[in-house]
């Protein structure tokens, strides 16, 4: 995306896929979840930064099977991401 990022974490290089296939030689580390306020491009970037930092803390080098949920209730607009953290060998 070409807009400014509002993420609170420094960027981390991480492979991200919506496909659930795990590459050969990789190990699954667990599921990671992040949720932030807002439903827009900035909230998506902020949420992705939070998700990659949580995965990185587990030792992950990639995320697979990523799912996006955007709740637009009047009183609680949120962007949430869920993915499986893996380590590529």
Predicted regions and their residues:
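N-terminal presequence-like segments and the immediate start of the first folded domain
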Residues: 1-31, 86
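Short, solvent-exposed loop/turn elements at beta->coil junctions and helix N-caps
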Residues: 19, 67-72
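Short, solvent-exposed coil/turn elements at secondary-structure transition points
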Residues: 22, 37-38, 69, 89
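Short, well-ordered alpha-helical segments
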Residues: 27-68
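Short acidic, glycine/proline-enriched helix-loop-strand junctions
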Residues: 41-42, 71-89
């Amino acid at each position: 995306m070409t807009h400014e990022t509002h993420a609170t974490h420094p960027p981390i290089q991480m492979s991200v896929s919506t496909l659930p296939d795990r590459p050969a030689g990789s190990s699954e580390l667990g599921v990671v979840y992040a949720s932030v306020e807002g439903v827009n491009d900035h909230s998506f970037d902020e949420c992705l930064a939070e998700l990659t930092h949580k995965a990185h803390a587990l030792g992950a080098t990639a995320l697979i099977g990523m799912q996006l949920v955007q709740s637009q209730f009047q009183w609680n607009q949120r962007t949430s991401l869920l993915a499986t953290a893996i380590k590529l060998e």
